[in-house]
Amino acid sequence: GDKELVAKETGKENPKVLSAGPEDTVFTYFMDHGSDDIVCVGGEDVSSSQLMAALKTAYEKKLYGKWVWFMEACHSGSMFGALPKDMNIYVITSSDGDHNAKMTNCPPNDVIGKENMATCLAGLWDNFYLDYVEQHPDCTIGEIFDAVHADVAKSSDQNVSEFGDLTFRDFKLSEFFGTLPAPSFRPVKMEKSTTTVPVSEVPKHLAMWRAIRADKSELAEAMKKYQEEVFKNAKKEVVLMKLGRALMNEKAADKAFKTAAETYSVD
């Protein structure tokens, strides 16, 4: 990539750019927040059309040979719906375009060494895929997708998805990811958490558990924070319903608000 141009456009002194060529394999693991057709990058939103334009430029300038993306974000599938199958790019997303991603190992399943971490320790999708790769270091990309898609579906509707050149399914992940440590250095299989929380609800969930775990000296402040999070969610619901009410009748707005995007019909 053009480091000087990126520095000029972003104002960053030493920006990271893709330094690869037509003989190189590239692996990108992206994790941040997302919504319909956007993901957050460095505090700013990047649209699906902007991402597609960047990938097209990289392809035309031969900045890579084969490129694999793993993206963890809500509605991450909405970023790659227009990805051509002939650009030597393959993508796995933690969710499709209609669903939020889920977090896992959240309170009360956030204990490490008998200590409560007071946070969600992993995304549901990346927890499954990293665990699978640890246990199957010689696996193909297709094996990862099939196994993780099935595992995630047991506890979430986020629908792990794949895009791009599906012939990449036959490649071993090690071709992009590198060689993992010897089996004796890899951890034993983790017990999966039964607690999953939509990313958008994590702040409220953490605030609730902070209040639950608070002692007398901390309880008032913890309850205040929890009430603030509950109010934020309630305010967002009311604003969305008022907008829906302005565009359609109240019953239709209520139906739209409560129905999953992939099953909703205006009829």
Regions found by a protein language model. Give the residues of each.
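Cysteine endopeptidase catalytic domains of the caspase/legumain-like
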Residues: 1-267
